A protein has these predicted regions:
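Flexible glycine/acidic-rich beta-alpha junction loops that bind and position SAM and/or redox cofactors
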Residues: 44-51, 67-134
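Conserved AdoMet/S-adenosylmethionine-binding subsite of the radical SAM
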Residues: 1-86
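Long C-terminal interaction/binding lobes of large macromolecular proteins
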Residues: 138-139
Length: 139
């Protein structure tokens, strides 16, 4: 029934690596019922480690290949809506620093803000593994 609703792409979020099992289950269930196009938001600079962002992006790229679907991921930088940083863009998450955030933003500028299909493109932009991703962040 969900696949009959004229929503293209289906919008879904993957904000925490701890939800990987539920996220992949929901995605696979959607594909099973005929949905092939997804728009995916990935929160970063919140409570997670930078490497968690890499894992969530990698999971989406791998799922595109495995399921033969399109998942366009849009990493979104977290900004508090309350407290001292609610009116500026200077918030830095506990496990992040300004250099990491700028590196992610620079890569996203080159990819026009999204990550789509294609393992080779992803690996050139974000690295083939955690170590290469972290090297990109500290460059």
């Amino acid at each position: 029934m969900l696949a009959q609703v004229p929503i293209r792409p289906l919008r879904i979020a993957f904000d925490d690596i701890k939800t990987e099992e539920a996220y992949t289950k929901a995605l696979k269930m959607s594909v099973k019922h005929g949905i092939k196009d997804f728009s995916n938001y990935l929160l970063y600079n919140f409570k997670e480690q930078p490497i968690d962002l890499y894992h969530r992006m990698r999971i989406n790229v791998d799922l595109c290949e495995e399921l033969n679907v399109s998942i366009y991921s849009f990493p979104m930088k977290y900004h508090p809506i309350r407290d001292e940083h609610s009116h500026d863009r200077d918030y830095i998450g506990k496990h992040w620093n300004r250099k990491y955030i700028r590196a992610v933003q620079a890569i996203l500028n080159a990819t026009k803000g999204k990550i789509g299909r294609g393992v080779s493109f992803f690996e050139k932009a974000f690295g083939r593994n955690e170590d290469e991703f972290m090297e990109l962040l500290i460059m």
